[in-house]
């Protein structure tokens, strides 16, 4: 059965990678879900601000797990680049806020027909403009729960971690209640 690719942006990666190990490139569930990042996420993680807040990202376990990317054919790369240019132009003229990497994730999502996991509200708006599939970190956790890839104890622990570091996604309370019924 072919994989169901799901792209994970920087904020979702940072919220999950420490608790669900390994996070990336591990198929799970009947639909063979598999999480991927883009190479540009590794570049973002070199920022001093992120390095000081998330020093664990340089540990071998996490760096090694971030070496797997979606396989992209040459023709797809060209289409992704063209789509990126169009999306990035829209960001610069109509919807300031998303980064170049955010726009690139949207371009990949459109070409691959894969959802992007993000809690970034600007990126979510951009995805909606281009009708790219997007899901929140909580929605991904629900898929993982339903697939037996995680359990509620782990999810509650992740949420406690977010609360401790004051890193709660937008609309968290309502979304958590809607998704998990707690």
Located regions from the model:
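Acidic, PIN/NYN-like endoribonuclease modules and their adjacent C-terminal/linker elements
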Residues: 124-182
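Active-site-proximal, substrate-binding regions of enzyme catalytic domains
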Residues: 2-112, 121, 156-161, 170-182
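Acidic, metal-binding active-site segment of PIN/NYN-like and related structure-specific nucleases
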Residues: 98, 105-140
């Amino acid at each position: 059965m072919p994989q169901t690719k799901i792209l994970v942006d920087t904020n979702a990666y940072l919220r999950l990678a420490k608790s669900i190990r390994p996070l990336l490139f591990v198929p799970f569930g009947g639909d063979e879900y598999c999480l991927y990042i883009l190479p540009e996420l590794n570049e973002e993680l070199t920022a001093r601000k992120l390095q000081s807040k998330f020093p664990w990202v340089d540990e071998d376990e996490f760096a090694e797990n971030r070496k797997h990317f979606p396989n992209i054919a040459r023709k797809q790369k060209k289409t992704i680049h063209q789509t990126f240019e169009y999306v990035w132009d829209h960001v610069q003229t109509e919807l300031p806020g998303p980064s170049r990497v955010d726009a690139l994730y949207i371009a990949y999502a459109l070409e691959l027909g894969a959802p992007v996991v993000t809690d970034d509200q600007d990126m979510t708006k951009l995805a909606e403009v281009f009708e790219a599939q997007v899901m929140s970190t909580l929605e991904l956790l629900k898929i993982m729960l339903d697939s037996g890839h995680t359990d509620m104890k782990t999810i509650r622990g992740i949420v406690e971690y977010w609360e401790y570091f004051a890193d709660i996604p937008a609309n968290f309370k309502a979304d958590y209640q809607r998704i998990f019924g707690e």
